[in-house]
Amino acid sequence: MNRVLCVVIIVLAVGYGALWLATNHYRDNALTYKAQRDKKARELEQANATITDMQVRQRDVAALDAKYSRELADARAENETLRADVAAGRKRLRINATCSGTVREATGTSGVDNATGPRLADTAERDYFILRERLITMQKQLEGTQKYINEQCR
């Protein structure tokens, strides 16, 4: 009976040891998988936060772009209206100019010709409006870029 009891105790000890090793192995695996899961959950939260931030920034940039595009279109329309008004004679393009010719004294009766005031040539007038439009475009682009840098590149 001693021998049987000794064999049973040894079998139980080996069984207990095997169960302990298996439990320890699966426990280590569970801890490893939990750590991996927690790491992936943090990465997912960070990715979601990044996506949300990017979406907010995209909406802000789209609103900024729409604002400055609208302002640029309004400025161009105003420039075209001014160009049409000058061409139709409703408005005059005033420049600070002086006549470079000298006044000649006539020996006969003095008089004044029916001369018009100084005026830009048609090509110079067209060039003026082209330069004005380009200046407006550059100003609006610069304002938009500065606003973008100040708001988005912080």
Swiss-Prot record:
Its main location: host cell. It is a single-pass type II membrane protein. InterPro entries: I-spanin. GO terms for biological process: viral release from host cell by cytolysis. It is found in: Host cell inner membrane. The chain crosses the membrane at residues 4-24. Residues 37-92 form a coiled coil. Component of the spanin complex that disrupts the host outer membrane and participates in cell lysis during virus exit. The spanin complex conducts the final step in host lysis by disrupting the outer membrane after holin and endolysin have permeabilized the inner membrane and degraded the host peptidoglycans. Host outer membrane disruption is due to local fusion between the inner and outer membrane performed by the spanin complex. Belongs to the Lambdavirus i-spanin family. The gene is Rz. Homodimer; disulfide-linked. Interacts (via C-terminus) with the spanin outer lipoprotein subunit (via C-terminus). Part of the spanin complex which spans the entire periplasmic space. The spanin complex is composed of one homodimer of the i-spanin linked by intermolecular disulfide bonds involving two Cys residues and one homodimer of the o-spanin covalently linked by an intermolecular disulfide bond involving one Cys. This is Spanin, inner membrane subunit. GO terms for cellular component: host cell plasma membrane; membrane. The lineage of its organism: Viruses, Duplodnaviria, Heunggongvirae, Uroviricota, Caudoviricetes. Keywords: Coiled coil, Cytolysis, Disulfide bond, Host cell inner membrane, Host cell lysis by virus, Host cell membrane, Host membrane, Membrane, Signal-anchor, Transmembrane, Transmembrane helix, Viral release from host cell. The coiled coil region is probably involved in host membrane fusion leading to lysis. Residues 1-3 are cytoplasmic. Residues 25-154 are periplasmic.
